[in-house]
Amino acid sequence: MNNVKDLQTIEETLKYLQFDNWEQSAPGLARSRELLGLLGNPEQKLKFVHIAGTNGKGSTAAMLASVLQHAGYRTGLYTSPHLLRFHERMRVNGEEIDDNSLISLTNTVRNAAERMSEMPTGFEIMTAIAFLYFVQEQCDIVSLEVGLGGRMDSTNVIPAPEVCVVANIGLEHTAILGDTVEKIAAEKCGIIKHGSHAVLFGQSESVENVAREKCAQEDVALTITAQEKLERISSSLDGQAFKYRGRGPYHLRLLGEYQLLNTLTVIDVCSALRSRGWDKLTDEAIDEGLSHAQWPGRLELLRRGPDFIVDGAHNPQCVDALMDSLAALYGDKKLIFLTGVLRDKDWQQMLRRALPLAKAFVVITPPSARALDENELAAWLNAQGVQAVPAKDTDDGVRRALELAGEDDAICSWGSLYFTGEVRRVLTEQ
């Protein structure tokens, strides 16, 4: 056994948690099971709502956590990646994990990991820390977001959750999850377990059929969200009001059509939880939770005059949803876009979708070996007939976007969650 010296400071702890070796590790749950066994199986002392999906799973997890908290349940929330700081990944009743808990629980998990024959991945270690934290904090229930996929994700070691949720599904991580939406859906639906209730975001028939098949195998009741039962009342930069399945009105603080549709999933999850005895989830609690829900970096309005919106859109499906939401908010008004893209993403398709709404672009090179150079991106955009200004970094990009904008203009930054976090940092420091 290795006698490793305990981590003493938050800086040391965060440095330790930065490693990510999942690409070098064989997929599977064996390492997580062994690690959690060494820690006394904290996951078996908790109740969960488990949430998978390509787009919207983080927003769904955050909105659900807000509703559960406002209903009076002590609620854990586990999400990834973080936007500004690591602590965001683990919250109880909206409060991020404190430094002392993070240091001491990381030491506990690290000491257990050192006793294993195969080192766990960074995400497996983080997930174990989160489970210990939620037990320590005596959570009634945890809103648990899957890291990647579902079936083989380290969060999938939990016993049957109260509700399994599958949010919107698209093509992503195809090398790991499969090259068709149906194969990816099968991986995501791998979180559905006997003894649970499943809720699926209403989408293509092929995905719905995959979910139905898995629920039949596991003998699990399935609810599919029904967009036709959504009645929109109002939508503005101040939020949205709506009814669903004849109930409401509900008020949502978050902007965007896609967030409104994610809310239907949350409401259906609450109905499933109510049927399992979580009877404090009244319509009043749902409304209260939705009207207070925050999910930074997703169609988030950071300032007015000019409006400055940030969004983490990073794939064609997300960009489609973002452009639909911006068109709904701003009508025919053209926007200034601040973005940077990765060469291995379908960047031309994403930018083509943004072109009809663009007054101009300010472009940067993201800090990644896979980044597309800002000058190359600006040249491509200029060739499409739109003004594009290259910027040397995020600070310069924000400055140039604000210089281009008049008081009545709107700026929207998008491209990745990391970039969104950087733009948020620059704007809040100004």
Locate the predicted segments by residue.
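N-terminal leader/targeting and accessory segments in enzymes
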Residues: 1-55, 59-74, 83-84, 138, ...
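ATP-dependent carboxylate-amine ligase catalytic core
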Residues: 25, 29, 33-44, 70-159, ...
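Nucleotide phosphate-binding/pyrophosphate-handling subdomain across enzymes
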Residues: 45, 141-144, 152-165, 169-172, ...
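Hydrophobic alpha-helical packing residues
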Residues: 64-69, 134, 273, 381, ...
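Beta-strand->loop->alpha-helix junctions that form or flank phosphate-binding loops
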Residues: 78-81, 200-202, 214-236, 253-257, ...
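Acidic, Mg2+-coordinating active-site environments of NTP-dependent enzymes
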Residues: 117-118, 138-145, 161-246, 263, ...
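C-terminal helical cap/extension that packs against the catalytic core
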Residues: 201-223, 237-238, 307-310, 316, ...
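Active-site-proximal loop/hinge segments that shape catalytic or ion-binding/gating pockets
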Residues: 416
